[in-house]
From Swiss-Prot:
Gene that specifies this protein: Nup160
Top-level taxon of origin: Eukaryota
Keywords, alphabetical: DNA damage, mRNA transport, Nuclear pore complex, Nucleus, Protein transport, Translocation, Transport
InterPro entries given in the database record: Nucleoporin_Nup160 (IPR021717), NUP160_helical (IPR056547), TPR_NUP160_C (IPR056536), TPR_NUP160_M (IPR056535)
Keyword Isomerase: no
Subunit structure: Part of the nuclear pore complex. Interacts with Nup98.
BP-aspect Gene Ontology terms: double-strand break repair via homologous recombination; mRNA export from nucleus; protein import into nucleus; regulation of nucleocytoplasmic transport
Protein name (Swiss-Prot/TrEMBL): Nuclear pore complex protein Nup160 homolog
Principal subcellular localisation of the protein: nucleus
Signal peptide region: none
Function text: Functions as a component of the nuclear pore complex (NPC). Involved in poly(A)+ RNA transport. Required for nuclear import of Mad. May play a role in double strand break DNA repair. Essential for nephrocyte development.
Consequence of gene disruption: RNAi-mediated knockdown in nephrocytes alters their cell morphology and function. Reduces total number of nephrocytes starting from larval stage and results in shortened lifespan.
Entry GO terms, CC: nuclear pore; nuclear pore outer ring
Length: 1411
């Protein structure tokens, strides 16, 4: 059977472009200066269309213009299914002049518009923008996207473009226009009630000539052979109703159809009738007048025309041809096969050489389209086209507890359900106020807010005086929302009424023009024809037999089975279908759902059974009457199958090009909309077939046979087509979701989304359409070009040169798109794109719908779902899904491409697969490692640390203990435990790490982290088995690298070594800390901390074995310079060995103790002087003097105890301070007294007394035994200050060295005091008070001789004698001392004599004894 016959007898289906941008009209007003005629003429809304003929040109392929007129307005819209045109809507308003006729003609690079109004004729030329032929800076893409109306401006009112025909009295009732083939002249024929005028306009100048076409009184000779009579006509019957021009052999004719159904052919050249025939007479009609409908004439070609003739009892279509007879005269012949017209009202029709297309309406106002194929005797008479029904309010089901606003908004604002203008007009009606706004500037989201606010205002108006319950509120809300929906529905029905149709010949489609939009009638496929139309199915079986192995019986069985499926579809109510869809969406078992449905079909409830018993029996009987049911069922399943399971997989995901305005096939806004609507229509039809077929299978086989292969296949198809319907209907935002950029960046950084470009198209302007469907967005961004790639690859077509009609392009593209969307398809273009949209709710819903029945690409879907859940913050769910997807890393193409793409393993595995080799377990294991690494990178960007540990543990379980990748995952476990604060687990992980270097690195991180978080007790308790030296090194390095001012590491090290019992290391740490405080710190408490460190160091060393009580100290810079100076006068060490030897100094206890005393002295000084830092390098002696000068005498003396310098300056300073305190009665002395240690001193209320008491205590405490240096220094200082000596000092001195005190007094000219002391000394020597002096005995014959200070006494006497001349006190003192000296001399003499006598006696006694 030829394919043409199959195409000719298949029906068509309406496709409405939905969710389009609002039309932006170019408004042009044309004023010809004529009188208003609108009130005198009743005009009907007419429409038509024109399809570009040069369909091989990419620019004009799938491109057409449709128009509609109403009174004085002509609206033209240029549409391209391939190119998104700009400024493609033109509205011409012929001021007060109704439009009668519109025609469009194409001439190479321009389109001519001819318009006839009741008072004028117009000709406009619109150039077609061709790339390369236009000047200026416009790019080729911009030129291609410019509509022919793009440059419309005020020149359209140029007088040369129109001619005024007003002034002929009566109003015209018909008109026709024509542009000659050479484009030189434009002809306009205007018919009035009584005459016919012809206007001829020269295109070059616009000059117009008017002729009247008249019937002559006598008939010429060459008309004698015409059939029919030309007499007996009235004026009314002779009025023309329809006309058409024809150009044959360079001669132009006008074919005129009159009200009496007479057809005349007029010659334009001589304005004479060439031929005439009465169609009613030829067809055997009794009445010459036309019937209740207007007879119409349509031009097919210059030789062929189609007529619609209305009679009293019926109507019909006939075709006429202008054919020359043997005598070269023109005759009109009737075509033999006439087509009876249906008994309904004709709205409009169009005809081609093979089809008649008619738009009908009935008394109820319903419209339908039908077509007749009259080029073959085997044609089906009339085949109806399936028009899209209006939105069904019964699909709006209110669920319990759901807000009516949510339900109605989701339904009303579903993408494509209602046009934006419809909702806006409904809003005006609902508000009942004259408040309008620019719809073009109003997005759907804003319009939705306006609608919700309007309904809410109405609700509040009804409730403002009442208090209602929740149930009453919901009832009122539902009623008002239903009222608003009714407004939407009314406007939608009104604005969707068809006004005409036009055959788009080059596209194999029909344009159905509506009041506010248009639709295309596309060819149906077999299942659509059988389910929707159901006409002439027996003949269809004959025509489809070639598709079924040329077996007529099988084709007949297939059609009979589809008849039963169609019957069941009509019997099942829409409520049940909607309920079934909901149950499938909720992933209930289809078999259980169908079993419940079949049980309900036969069960009688309160409302009776769903289907009458006779219907059930009828269905069962029809099934039994199909002789070859099983083959027919298998054939139906083959037709439903969308993919070839034996076809090798192809990678179409590499089609990365996006839609450009320069145009891909079906790439414009209109093309994409028609394509997506067609996919949706076919998916819904096939889903209905699968659903009804499953019911029939259950009814035929019963519950026990539902596991057969055919049933399982149908179940798979049912779920698959439901998925396609879900994709086609699911709303999705046209713009990128929140967080899209962040999600894409995360995927890109993890190298999981680098195989293709961004998933959103940028060239299509949505103009406020916030939402579209998932399918539409997919086609816009990637789906169409992937489908075109498949079309070119499989069909070897050239889209740039070959002419493709809708049957070849649209249906094939739909087939390839279905293959991409098919859940069981190996092509992963759609899942990949959906994954990249980052619409997580939709991704999760998609995976859920396929979860429990589709095994193809299940690992990829788990991976997609896991990524989606991770982005949504549900990492705990994502972990398990990532683990489940692990096994598909080398099996699933999607995972293989996206996970392994940028790894070294990718090329190796790809070569193995291409050679057909089996992938080794080692490579599989390595692939899993790469998989987990990328997944871990993804989790790291989400900071999901807990789950990274789980993933790493999963990877570790896959690896062998000696695997080189194992330490990496162990390090990952450690790092994430560390970041989470699981320090014990982190330590365990680092100890178990198989790589020593990683173990040390991890230990360093652990130490640093624990120090930063102040977890020192935890750091102390770890055992560090095998890592202690490394640990100490790390801690020491950290201690030295940190500022000493905020450094707790030294204290930790001291505690650590102390805890381990290593006191020598503990002392070293403390000494190093003290050095750091000395060298690096400028903190106020640095000296305090240094002293504390040195003190701790001393304590630790005391606990060490005496053999190891030393510390090795590095020589500091200044110390090294001092050492060099000591080595050599020239400043150089003696040799390199000496220099190296001096780099380290060994310190013993005494050295450290001296350093401690020095530090404590500096600390004391720092309390009272701000310039202490300047004296840090001062010697101990210098420092002691500084302390003394600051009144810190006890501190200065403490410093001196560890050193050998003299303390005499300290006591001299203190002595001076005591004298000053005595002489100055102010309280300043208390300031320096409080800075000294007076804990053991009795309290005195007088500062001077406290000062002398302090001096006494310090002298006593610090004077060495048998030494008078300190007292001498104090006495000298007192004498030098001419101060009195305190009695305690004199008494102490007398007991130690009275003669020295006497000498000091004499030396400082304190003669009277010296005289008194001299008298006391002499008296003591003589035995009177000797216990107050250092004498151990008095002058006595039995005692040794005493040393008498004869020089001092002599000098004292001399001084007294000299001063006694002028002062009586000195004279008396002189005499008294002289007297005492004389007494002492006498006593000495006597004693000496006695000693001599005794010596003589003793000697004698000894001699006698010897004898």
């Amino acid at each position: 059977m030829p394919t043409s016959k199959l195409q000719a007898n298949m029906s068509y289906r309406e496709v409405i472009p939905r969710n389009l941008s609002p039309a932006e009209w170019i408004e042009v007003k044309i004023n010809t200066g004529t009188q208003s005629t609108l009130q005198d003429l009743k005009t009907f809304e007419t429409s038509g269309g024109y399809c570009y003929k040069n369909t091989k040109n990419v620019q004009t392929r799938n491109r057409f213009i449709y128009w509609r007129t109403y009174q004085d307005v002509l609206e033209l819209s240029e549409v391209s299914l391939d190119i998104s045109l700009q400024r493609n809507h033109l509205r011409l308003r012929f001021t007060d002049s109704a439009v009668l006729n519109v025609s469009l003609t194409e001439q190479g690079t321009s389109v001519t518009l001819l318009v006839v109004t009741v008072s004028s004729v117009h000709r406009y030329v619109f150039p077609l923008k061709v790339a390369g032929q236009e000047g200026g800076a416009a790019s080729p893409e911009d030129l291609l996207s410019q509509s022919i109306f793009y440059d419309v401006n005020d020149k359209i009112n140029d007088p040369s473009t129109y001619y005024v025909t007003d002034g002929f009295g009566t109003m015209p009732n018909a008109a026709v226009s024509y542009l000659t083939q050479d484009s030189q002249s434009a002809y306009f024929a205007v018919a009035y009630q009584s005459k016919l005028l012809l206007h001829v306009m020269k295109c070059s100048t616009g000059h117009t000539i008017t002729h009247e076409i008249k019937e002559p009184k006598l008939m010429p000779w060459f008309l004698s052979n015409l059939k029919g009579a030309l007499t007996g006509r009235s004026e009314t019957l002779e009025a023309a109703t329809s006309m058409a021009f024809s150009e044959i052999g360079g001669e132009i004719f006008i074919l005129v159809l009159y009200r009496n159904n007479e057809l005349r052919l007029w010659s334009v050249d001589n304005l004479q009738t060439v031929a005439s025939i009465n169609c009613s007479t030829e067809l055997g009609q009794d009445s010459a007048a036309q019937g209740p409908q207007n007879s119409q004439l349509r031009k097919i070609s210059d030789q062929n025309f189609c007529l619609f003739l209305s009679h009293n009892s019926r109507a019909e279509f006939i075709c006429v041809s202008i054919m020359p007879d043997a005598d070269d005269a023109s005759v009109i012949n009737l075509v033999q096969n006439m087509v009876p017209a249906p008994q309904t009202d004709l709205v409009d029709f169009d005809a081609t050489s093979s089809h008649i297309w008619a738009l009908w309406s009935n008394a109820e106002g319903d419209f339908h389209v039908s077509a007749a194929y009259f080029a073959s005797n085997n044609a089906i008479k009339w085949v109806s086209a399936a028009l899209e029904p209006p939105p069904d309010r019964y699909c709006l089901t209110m669920e319990q507890g759901v807000d009516p606003r949510e339900t109605y908004c989701s339904y009303i604002f579903h993408p494509g359900r209602f046009d934006r203008n419809v909702i806006a007009k409904a809003l005006y009606m609902f508000r009942r106020v004259n408040l309008q706004f620019d719809v073009k500037q109003l997005s759907m989201s804003v319009l939705k807010e306006q609608v919700c606010q309007a309904v809410e205002d109405e609700i509040q108006n009804e409730l403002k005086d009442f208090v209602v319950t929740d149930e009453e509120y919901l009832e009122i809300s539902t009623r008002l929302w239903d009222r608003f929906y009714s407004c939407c529905e009314q406007y939608h029905i009104k604005l969707s009424e068809p006004t005409g149709l036009a055959v788009l010949g080059g596209m194999d489609a029909v344009c159905l023009v509506r009041r506010q939009s248009f639709a295309l009638l596309r060819p149906c496929e077999v299942l659509e024809h059988l389910l929707l139309i159901g006409e002439h199915n027996d003949e269809v079986a004959t025509y489809v037999a070639p598709l079924f192995r040329n077996d007529p019986e099988m084709a007949k069985g297939f059609v009979e089975l589809m008849n039963v499926v169609t019957l069941l579809d009509k019997l099942i109510s829409e409520d049940i279908k909607i309920e079934l869809d909901k149950q499938l969406y909720q992933r209930e078992s289809p078999v259980e759902v169908i079993s419940k449905l079949v049980a309900r079909i036969s069960m009688i409830d309160d409302n009776g059974p769903i289907l009458p018993s006779n219907c059930v029996r009828q269905i069962q009987q029809k099934l039994q009457n199909i002789p070859n049911l099983e083959p027919a069922l298998e054939m139906l399943l083959d037709v439903l199958c969308m993919i070839d399971p034996d076809e090798p997989p192809h990678d179409y995901s590499l089609s990365t090009r996006f839609l450009q305005s320069s145009g891909a096939l079906m790439g414009s806004e209109y093309g994409l909309s028609i394509l997506s609507e067609t996919v949706k229509q076919m998916a819904m039809i096939r889903f209905s077939v699968c659903r009804n077929l499953l019911v029939l299978q259950y009814m035929a086989y019963g519950q026990n046979e539902m596991e057969s292969e055919n049933v399982l296949t149908n179940l798979n198809y049912l779920n698959s087509y439901y998925t396609l319907v879900w994709i086609a209907e699911t709303p999705i935002s046209s713009s990128t979701p929140a967080g899209f950029e962040a999600s894409i960046q995360r995927l890109s950084r993890a190298q999981l989304f680098s195989g293709y470009n961004r998933p959103y198209s940028s060239h299509l302007k949505h103009n406020g359409n916030d939402q579209t469907t998932l399918l539409r967005l997919f086609l816009e961004s990637k789906g169409l070009f992937s489908a075109l790639t498949m079309l070119l690859k499989h069909d070897s077509l050239s889209l740039d040169s070959e002419q493709l009609n809708l049957r070849q392009s649209l249906l094939q593209l739909v087939g390839y798109i279905n293959k991409m969307l098919w859940p069981g398809s190996p092509i992963y273009v759609f899942p990949e794109w959906l994954f990249g949209t980052c619409h997580h709710i939709i991704v999760q819903d998609y995976v859920r719908i396929l979860s429990n029945w589709c095994s193809v690409q299940k690992h990829a879907r788990r991976f997609m779902l896991a990524v989606s859940l991770l982005d949504c913050g549900e990492a705990h769910k994502a972990v398990h899904l990532f683990h489940e997807a692990e096994s598909g890393i080398v099996e699933d193409d999607f995972l293989f491409e996206h996970v392994l793409k940028n790894t070294p393993l990718y090329g190796k595995l790809q070569n193995s697969v291409s050679r057909g080799d089996t992938i080794s377990p080692e490579d599989t294991k390595l692939a899993i490692v790469h998989y987990y690494l990328k997944v871990i990178q993804l989790f790291e960007q989400h900071s999901a640390l807990d789950y990274i540990i789980q993933l790493a543990d999963m990877a570790i379980r896959v690896l062998q203990p000696d695997d080189p990748q194992l330490p990496m995952f162990q390090s990952i476990v450690f790092n994430n435990h560390l970041q989470l604060g699981h320090y014990v687990e982190a330590y365990t992980a680092l100890v178990n790490n198989a790589d020593i270097s990683r173990r040390k690195d991890c230990l360093r991180q652990l130490v640093i982290t624990l120090f930063q978080n102040k977890c020192l007790p935890l750091l102390m308790q770890f055992s560090y088995i095998g890592l202690q030296d490394e640990f100490e090194s790390i801690v020491e390095s950290r201690a030295r690298s940190m500022s000493i001012d905020q450094n707790e590491v030294y204290n930790f090290l001291y505690a650590f070594h102390t805890n381990k019992g290593n006191m020598r290391k503990a002392s070293t740490v403390m000494y190093e800390q003290a050095m750091r405080f000395q060298v690096d710190s400028d903190a106020p408490n640095a000296l305090e901390k240094r002293c504390s460190s040195l003190l701790i160091c001393l304590n630790c060393l005391h606990l060490v074995d005496s053999r190891y009580r030393w510390i090795a100290k590095p020589v500091l810079g200044d110390e090294q310079v001092i050492t060099i100076d000591q080595d050599n006068d020239d400043g150089e060490p003696k040799c390199d060995e000496d220099k190296r030897g001096q780099e380290v100094v060994v310190l013993e206890l005494a050295d450290i103790r001296r350093e401690l005393v020095h530090a404590e002295a500096l600390r004391e000084l720092s309390f009272y002087r701000k310039d202490t830092a300047a004296y840090e390098r001062a010697t101990p002696e210098e420092l002691s003097y500084l302390l003394a000068s600051s009144g810190l005498y006890t501190a200065a003396l403490k410093l001196s105890r560890g050193h050998s310098f003299s303390v005499l300056p300290i006591f001299e300073s203190l002595t001076s301070a005591c004298v000053a305190a005595t002489e100055d009665k102010s309280s300043d002395a208390w300031n320096w007294l409080q800075n000294n240690d007076m804990a053991d001193l009795p309290h005195r209320s007088n500062a001077a007394d406290m000062a002398w008491t302090l001096l006494q205590k310090l002298v006593v405490d610090n004077e060495a035994k048998d030494s008078t240096l300190i007292r001498k220094s104090v006495v000298q200082r007192l004498l030098g200050l001419n101060a009195f000596l305190p009695q305690w000092l004199i008494n102490s001195y007398k007991l130690s060295h009275s003669r020295e005190l006497l000498h000091l007094l004499v030396k400082h000219n304190r003669l009277l005091e010296a005289a008194d002391l001299g008298c006391e000394i002499i008296a003591g020597m003589l035995g009177a008070g000797s216990e107050y002096f250092e004498f151990k005995h008095a002058v006595n014959i039995a005692n040794p001789q005493l040393c008498f200070p004869i020089s001092t006494i002599d000098l004292l006497l001399h001084g007294l004698k000299i001063n006694g001349k002028d002062d009586l006190d000195y004279e008396m003192a002189y005499f008294k001392l002289e007297e005492e000296v004389q007494r002492y001399i006498e006593t000495i003499k006597r004693t000496t004599d006695d000693k001599m006598s005794m010596a003589v006696l003793q000697m004698r006694t000894d001699l006698q004894e010897e004898r």
